[in-house]
Amino acid sequence: MSRKSATVLAFGDYRSRPRTLYFTRSELNQLLSLYSRHVARGVWRDYAIDHRDGMALFSVFRHTHEAPAYSIVKTAPAQARPTEFIVQSGRQRLRVSRSLPDALEIFQTRLSLVIAEPG
């Protein structure tokens, strides 16, 4: 009598990977337009685009070797949630919107990054 041996399967091999999320050409044009206006005023110096599971990030820097001054995050739509655009500074969420132009309106007012000094 022969016995069949059990086969161990790793679920990770069969699960679909989250689809990489990108900015559309229109969204990228809006972000780069905002970036170029701030560069012309001498406020921003560098930017980075990053893609993570379920999100795309556009980060702007005042100095190249610092943490981003602001990040604009595009999140992937979930079952009951549409795509969202989040403007954040560090861990603080400054604006959440379903459309990029609405999210970027926060930059129409003069924003200034305030950092508390220890003491």
Segments (PLM) and residue ranges:
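Short, charged, intrinsically disordered terminal tails
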Residues: 6-9, 16-21, 105-119
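Negatively charged, low-complexity tracts enriched in Asp/Glu with abundant Ser/Thr
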Residues: 4-56
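Hydrophobic residues embedded in beta-strands of well-ordered beta-sheets
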Residues: 55-58, 85
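Short aromatic-glycine-(Arg/Gly/Cys) micro-motifs in beta-strand/loop hairpins
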Residues: 4-6, 68-91
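A generic structural motif
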Residues: 61-63, 88
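Short, charged/polar surface micro-motifs in flexible loops or helix N-caps
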Residues: 41, 53-56, 63-68, 78
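Short, compact, well-ordered microdomains
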Residues: 79-117
